[in-house]
Amino acid sequence: MSKKFTMTLLSSSLAGLLVMSGGVSAQNGTYSVLQDDSQKSGPVKYGSTYEVVKTVDNGNFRYEVKEKKNDKRTLFKFDSEGNVTVKGKGITHTLHDPALKDFARTAEGKKNEQNGNTPPHKLTDSAVRGVYNKVYGLEKTEITGFSVEDGENGKVSLGSDAKASGEFSVAVGNGARATEKASTAVGSWAAADGKQSTALGVGTYAYANASTALGSVAFVDNTATYGTAAGNRAKVDKDATEGTALGAKATVTNKNSVALGANSVTTRDNEVYIGYKTGTESDKTYGTRVLGGLSDGTRNSDAATVGQLNRKVGGVYDDVKARITVESEKQKKYTDQKTSEVNEKVEARTTVGVDSDGKLTRAEGATKTIAVNDGLVALSGRTDRIDYAVGAIDGRVTRNTQSIEKNSKAIAANTRTLQQHSARLDSQQRQINENHKEMKRAAAQSAALTGLFQPYSVGKFNATAAVGGYSDQQALAVGVGYRFNEQTAAKAGVAFSDGDASWNVGVNFEF
């Protein structure tokens, strides 16, 4: 050790004295502190204001800084790592100073020998005054609104009137409360009153067990177990167990249902509803959204796209058109055939002529001549048969025409149905695009939260901010933390992106 690092024994009778008492050994020595100008040039100078007393307790070194005057008043104590433990009002702080650590390493022989005019350590009068001023300030600092309960079921509360009464509960914010086991409330007047419940945001309420409320004034009813409400004034209402409300003023009133999007309201159990409420409580009118970006459905439970329906209906239309064409050709051929047969029969008729007295004057195409009246009767009968045949043909043509009209109406109805499906699919496409943006915002928020720092120094609060991004979305995260001692620290963070928010709260235990 350097000769410049002098050690002055209080008296020769104390040199090498070893005192044994109750199994604890102690060895005392007094060390000098450097003057402020000793590190500039010239011989090393030692001050007359402060001294350091070294003790050894079961192999652990402790150093006590005292004034040389004023009855050797103790200013502070530090360990071999340069840490000063300060007991303030309501909390214990740990202060670290590099000059103290350098002094301890020199006193314990852990530094290389110093030669010439180089000071053996960095502890000067001004360094002692600086540390003492910090110690004095911390001793006089009173922290209110902060509480940590020691033990296996520790509870943490931070903020005016904050209350954490459940096991492993955390309450952060003015008037925040966490009353059940493993509950967490972060934000002014946030309330987590269910077991394993989480409330994050100003005025959020997570009343049910295993419920989560995120966003200003988000609410989960105490009967809606496993409910999740995320968004400004989002709500999971009475008996809506396992309900999820995502979006500003989204409301779930049914079991195992999801209200997706701002102002969306569920209408039945086991439903995902993306429509939004547009009217008052009395008229209960709803708007629609487009769910976009869908692939063609392949299973019976999958949604079909407009393109998929168009292709299917196009095939049906082509098939119907082909069948109508074939049937029309058949009917035309049949009509032509029957008309030809009638024409042949008409051409084979018997032509007769009569005079003014009604007597037969000629008979063409007949093997026998008959009376005019008989001939007219026979001709009338043949004409009736011709009329009957033509009437039958007209009936068939009429039926074909009716069938064609019926098919045309069916095709028109199918076209209207396709147009309705197209409108619904357009709404679904728009909603999927919004969901895609929401997922990218969530990823950006997660990246920002990852960038928040944990407090490292004991007794120190830290406020930290970070930014994160994913694809074309960015997020800002802010957080606070506090290290209670070398083994325990806690932090909380909130990330914001385009009106959405996510959060985390963590407690760290080191062994």
Swiss-Prot record:
UniProt KW Transport keyword: yes
Example of a GO cellular component annotation carried by this entry: cell surface
Residue ranges of the TM segments: 461-471, 474-485, 488-497, 501-511
Its membrane topology: Multi-pass membrane protein
Annotated region described as Left-handed coiled-coil (LHcc), given as residue ranges: 376-441
GO annotation (BP), single: protein secretion by the type V secretion system
Region (Required to bind IgG): 384-418
Neck: annotated span: 288-303
Signal sequence annotation: 1-26
Chain positions covered by the region annotation Outer membrane translocation of the passenger domain: 418-460
Region (Translocator domain): 461-511
Keywords in alphabetical order: Cell outer membrane, Coiled coil, Membrane, Protein transport, Signal, Transmembrane, Transmembrane beta strand, Transport
Inducing stimuli: In strain ECOR 9 expression is greater at 37 than 27 degrees Celsius and increases upon entry into stationary phase (at protein level). Upon expression from a plasmid in strain AB1157 (with its own leader sequence) more protein is seen at 37 than 27 degrees Celsius (at protein level).
Region: Saddle domain, residue numbers: 350-375
Stretches for region Surface exposed passenger domain: 27-417
KW Ribosomal protein (keyword) present: no
Cell location: Cell surface; Cell outer membrane
Protein role: Binds (in a non-immune fashion) to the Fc portion of human IgA and IgG; binding occurs on the cell surface. Confers the ability to survive exposure to human serum exposure. Binds to the Fc portion of human IgG, IgA and to whole mouse antibodies also via Fc. Upon overexpression cells acquire an extra cell surface layer that forms a zipper-like contact between cells; cells autoagglutinate and form biofilm more readily, suggesting it may play a role in defense against a host.
Subunit structure: Homotrimer; can probably form mixed heterotrimers in vivo. Will form mixed heterotrimers with EibA or EibC; these are correctly located in the outer membrane and bind IgG Fc, although less well than homotrimers. In denaturing gels runs as a band of about 210 kDa. Binds the Fc portion of immunoglobulins; binds more than 1 Fc per subunit, can be modeled to bind 3 Fc per trimer.
Domain comment in the entry: The signal peptide, cleaved at the inner membrane, guides the autotransporter protein to the periplasmic space. Then, trimerization and insertion of the C-terminal translocator domain in the outer membrane forms a hydrophilic pore for the translocation of the passenger domain to the bacterial cell surface. The crystallized passenger domain (residues 161-440) is an entwined, elongated trimer with a head domain, a neck and 2 extended coiled-coil regions of differing handedness separated by a saddle region.
Name used for this protein in its record: Immunoglobulin-binding protein EibD
